[in-house]
Each structure stands twice: as C-alpha cells, then as structure tokens.
C-alpha cells in the first residue's frame, strides 16, 4: 500500500471537474445554449459518484488522506446522507486529522450526525474539550455509537461522571460489562477515578491490580501509579508498581523516568488530571486493546482524538506514529515523532523509532544521526539494542559491538542473558573477522535456545566456511531447514553447504528451491549460478549471475559477479562461504 497514490495531474483534473460540477456558476452567457440545468445537475451527480468511487479506491489502497478529501467532497454534494458523513469522518480520523473531523461533524445536519457513529464520537470529544460535559454525556448514552465503541463510551461516561461525583463514577465503573479481555483496563480506570477523588491508597491498589493483568498501556499506567505513590513518600510502593510493570522486560520510558527520579532522590510531583487530561488517559487506556490495536486505521482514529484532548500525552503520539507506519505513511509518522520534545520521557523512543522509519526509507545517514540522538537522551536497554541493530545494519560495526557489549554486560550483572542480543553480537563479530568470538556468542545463544533455526543455520554455516566440523555444520543447517522449510535464506544455506562439499546436484536442488522462495535475493541467485557452473550448466549460470546483478547487490558482490560473467569460476571450487546477517 502506498500513501498519495493519486497523481498531481489526476488531482488537478478532478478539481477542475468538481469546480465545474459544484460551483455556483448558473447558466449564463458563457454557457453553451445546449447546456441545460438538467445536464448540470447530472454532472453534479456524476461528480459525486466519481468522488465516492475514488474515495473507496483510496481506502482500499491504503491512502486515508485522499479518501478523506474525496469523501468530504462527496459529502458536500449530499450533506444529508449519514452513511456518507460516517465514511468521511472515519477517513478523516484515520488520516489523523481530529480537528477536521470535528469541523465536519459539527457542520453536519443534526439528524445526519445522530446516525453516524464516528461523527458522534468526534462530537463527544469536542464537547469534552470545550467543557460541554452534559452534552457529551447525552451523546454517550446514544446507541448509535455501536459495538465497536461500547468500551470507549463506558470509559468516558465513567470518567465524566466521576469528575462531578467521584463515588457515583466509581459505582458506574463497577457496572461496566465484565470482559476478561479488558479487565486490566477496567482496573486502571478505577485507579484513575479514585486518584481523581483523592482516595490514593485505593487508587494505588487498583493500579496494582491492573498491572497484574494483561494491559497494553502498562508503562503509562505504571508511571502514573508509581508517581502517585512516590509523591506521598511511599517509595517502596512506587518501586513495587514499577516492578510489576517491568516483568521480564526492561523498564519502559515512563517508568524509567520515575525510577531515575527515585534513584536520584528527587521529589516526584503528584499526578494531576483535569477533565480533558483524564478523559484522554481513559480513552488512551481502552484504545490499546483488541480490534483497535490490530487496525492501523482504528488506532489512528482513536489516538488522534486522544491527542485532541491532551496534545502532551506522548505515549499516545507514539501510538499514532505507529499507526501511520502501518498505514505506510512514513512522512506522517516522522512528523508525529518529531512533535515529541526532548524533555519528554518518551523522547528517546520517538528518536529511535524515527531512525527506524528513516532507515526503512534508505535514508541511512539521517537514521544514524537520529539513532545517536536517541542514545544521547537515554541509555535504556531497549534504546541500546535498537541502536545497536541500526548501526549493525549500516556497517558501523564498532559502534554496534560497543552497544551490544554494554547490553550483554548489564544482562549478566542481573543474572540474565538474551539469545537475540548474543546472536546480533555474533554477526557483528563475524563481519569484523572475529569468528572465534562469534562462535562463543552463538554457543551461548544456543544454550538458551537450542532449537532456534537462525542460530543453527549461522553456526553451521560458520563451521563449514572455516573448513572444520563440516559434517556437524551440515547437520545443524539440516535441522534449521527442517524447522523453516519455507525460509529462502536457510534453504540457501543448505544448498550452499552442499556446494562447499562438492555435492553439486544436491546443491542445485536446494538452491533452486531457495530461489523460488526468495527470487529477489541476489546472494541466492549468485549461489545458484555458481552451482550451475560447477554442474556443467554454464549458460544457466550466466543467466543467474546476470539476474543477481540486475538486483543491485552490495558493491563487493557486484564486483565478483562481473568477474564471473567475464571469466567464469576458477578451476577449483572456492572455499569461502558467504556470511548471513
């Protein structure tokens, strides 16, 4: 899917047609005598239909911005159609433009808006933002919001009730449908309500309950609860909530900020949520679940509305950026990430995510600069690992090695080890001509995950390339291939291992399969060409080498491919075995 699929010329033509069709130009001297009012009306109808079809196509091709523009234009032609209003509002919110969605819903006839769930949701958020709480509550009671928004409606209703009558709000929270999938979120909501009421001990207990259950927003909830406890001098209680949030993973950004304050002996302020902030937090908590989490469009809709209520909720901005990435809208994702200031606890996460977005766009120099900015802001484990991978993929092996060393040493100090980080460092060591060190890391990783195909494949490859333990190496690769028979790079490993052993018929069999699985991998096509050459099929070998060259391989491989096309392979098979990332 690609955002912005409509070409400038198409947009211009559509705009010109729309201007003719829907402008206020009445028939006059400039209009041909044969152009009747009925024909103008038909043109308007055709334009409306064209806008509708174009918008639907934009939705199907993953371009919410174009979909929103064309649905809104179609709505302008038929402002009484609630179905069209709903589509226009959904697309506008999916594009991340809450303000435009609110304007659209606010300008619609009341009877149309009353039948459009997303328009009602936009109006509810606008009512809360503008302090029209009774109007918001009235809208929340309307059944038009539908099953998709039932949990959200319940959370917002509880919060708005609690703002005016905390005990009644808490009682209303008890009446929410008991659904196992949102039990953690419901406990967090009760914590918010009790904190708002000043019942801090009870609030902390419900935050504790929430963190003992599955909870998508656990870092934000834990940071809130830990800050509440620390502000009251209950340091051990704060650390307990932090420990519950971390589990087997390293601390998230919100919790890490509170933990740093505790370790430094700094005073932690009591969290304060006004009506808007609390509604935003309630909405954020429930929007990390189920279908909303799995759909980038729904996620963008919800988090755009959350940020309309609280633009400073950085965790929601990260979630919005993630939705944009999944919509294949890298520029929008970068803009959202860059809006998070360096002073935010979530700044380092925003920078390292921006680095990943830039790297995916092959803007590696900018990505590395952004990765360095993330490291300057935080040395959290997740930041170190992601920065290590970023540097590894871009050839800064010394930097990657240093970062992975730091993570592995810190893990060891806690009595832990992570096979993925060991594997990453092994690849760096191997590419730095330190096979002995790479082998040590691979053995350590296999001690943790003895059946992991990636590890079996890499170690087996390395042994065969070194010309020792060849049978053991082949056995490891065969185990990897049995576990992942549809992974082209592993089947390539198996074929290349047979090639190194001089078993060219078997090599061709596996390498042909690898090429079917990964037809755009120049390394696999290069290997297949070598196997064909050794198998006496020189013309087919040249064809594969040419195909590999067309795929624009890395410079070193391009040089060897050109040499092989010029001279073929030397008389004896080479002993070098290409490494794998």
Language-model-derived ranges and their functions:
Residues 25-103, 114-118, 138, 259-263, ...:
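N-terminal leader/linker segments that initiate helical-solenoid repeat arrays
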Residues 38-42, 72-79, 106-114, 141-149, ...:
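Solenoid-like repeat scaffolds
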Residues 43-51, 78-85, 112-121, 146-156, ...:
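Generic helix N-cap/helix-start motif at coil->alpha-helix transitions
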Residues 56, 90, 125, 159, ...:
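Residue-level recognition of tetratricopeptide repeat
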Residues 59, 93, 128, 162, ...:
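Position-specific recognition of the canonical hydrophobic site in helix A of tetratricopeptide repeat
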Residues 62, 96, 131, 165, ...:
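Residue-level detector of the short coil/turn that links helix A to helix B
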Residues 98-110, 133-145, 166-180, 201-211, ...:
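Alpha-helical repeat scaffolds
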Residues 110, 144-148, 227-253, 260, ...:
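TPR/TPR-like (Sel1-like) alpha-helical repeat modules
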